[in-house]
Structure formats: structure tokens, C-alpha cells
């Protein structure tokens, strides 16, 4: 029974019964023919995932994320946005710039003390915070995810692959294929 859609109206959701801990096999029957390819299937829910090489295990989802890739914090296939709440104490009034030089995402939106300062998307990955008064300042950074770890060619074994096209996914009969997951870092 169809129960809504995921990301795009063409990707239908089917409700599963409650799954209990342990080894679970889900069998899917679909039409398959020579010129067709199977598409990805996803198990969606409020749980985390650990990926070790080619092995994937459902686990409890992390309650909070630390700085570092969400891939290693039970969210390897999460491709939505991640908002970080942090802050600092300014010891004297000063003009400040924030640099976010290492984030995995399409861009990052920055707010300081609730004021939207704009986005960071290209080198040198800096944003002007302006004049910051003495005292505590809340900083909010939202990293906008990409769909790579969800829909990308995560079994392509070529590092720094220069071309993304149909054959980027169809690597099963070549040295480009690997059973392990090659995921991109997401978050800060």
C-alpha cells in the first residue's frame, strides 16, 4: 500500500510493519528486464545507521551531533540540512569574520545573535559578522545537504571521479565497482 512519497513524487513510500531488533530480510519483487536497471530502495525511519565497509547496521540515532561529519555519527545517508548551535564570548568590542573552511554540503547559512548574515558557498568560505559587542554571542550555522550519499554513485571506487553520468552508477562489471560505500562527509 502506497503511503506518500520520499524526496520526489516519483519515489513512492510503502509502509512496513514494525521491525524488531535482529537480522531482517526484506524481499522486493519488481519487473526487471535486460535494458532496465533496479533503482535504490530505502528503509526510512527514526533510527541511525553504522556503515563499516560494505556492512550496514541499523542503530539508535545520535541524540546530538558534534562538529565532524554526520556520516560517522549514525547519519551516513542523511542528505537534509543540519543546523549547529554554538557561540563564543567576545572579550572586547571587535569586528569579526567567521571562516567555515571545511564543511560537507552545498552551502552554509550563518546567523549571529538571531540575525541572518547570509551564506557561505565559495572560497575563502568567510562571512563578515560585523562589529561584535563584548559578551556572549549565539552562532547558528545551517549546512545545506546534497543528495550524494542518498542518490549518488556511492559504489564507484574511483577517487576524484571527473564525470558524473549514467555510467558513474553502472560500475558493477568494471574495476570502478566496490561493494563498500564511498560516502562524502556531511556537516561541519
Please identify what each model-predicted range represents.
Residues 1, 26, 88-90, 94-114, ...:
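Aromatic-lined ligand-binding clefts that engage carbohydrates, nucleic acids, or primary amines
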Residues 17, 29-33, 50, 89-91, ...:
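Solvent-exposed residues in well-ordered beta-strands and their adjoining turns
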Residues 31-60, 144-188:
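Glycine/proline-rich low-complexity spacer/linker segments in large multi-domain proteins
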Amino acid at each position: 500500500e502506497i503511503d506518500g512519497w520520499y524526496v520526489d513524487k516519483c519515489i513512492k513510500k510503502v509502509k512496513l510493519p514494525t521491525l524488531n531488533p535482529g537480522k531482517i530480510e526484506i524481499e522486493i519483487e519488481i519487473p526487471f528486464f535486460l535494458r532496465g536497471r533496479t533503482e535504490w530502495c530505502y528503509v526510512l525511519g527514526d533510527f541511525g545507521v553504522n556503515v563499516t565497509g560494505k556492512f550496514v547496521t541499523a542503530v539508535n540515532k545520535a541524540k546530538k551531533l558534534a562538529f565532524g561529519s554526520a556520516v560517522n555519527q549514525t547519519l551516513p545517508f542523511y542528505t537534509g540540512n543540519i543546523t549547529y548551535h554554538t557561540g563564543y564570548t567576545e572579550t572586547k568590542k571587535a569586528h569579526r569574520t567567521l571562516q567555515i573552511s571545511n564543511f560537507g554540503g552545498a552551502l552554509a547559512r550563518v546567523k549571529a545573535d538571531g540575525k541572518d548574515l547570509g551564506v557561505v558557498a565559495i572560497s575563502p568560505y568567510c562571512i563578515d559578522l560585523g562589529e561584535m559587542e563584548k559578551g556572549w554571542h549565539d552562532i547558528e550555522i545551517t549546512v545545506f545537504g546534497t543528495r550524494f550519499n542518498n542518490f549518488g554513485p556511492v559504489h564507484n571506487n574511483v577517487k576524484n571521479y571527473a564525470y558524473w553520468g549514467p555510467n558513474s552508477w553502472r560500475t558493477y562489471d568494471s574495476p570502478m565497482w566496490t561493494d563498500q560505500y564511498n560516502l562524502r562527509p556531511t556537516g561541519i
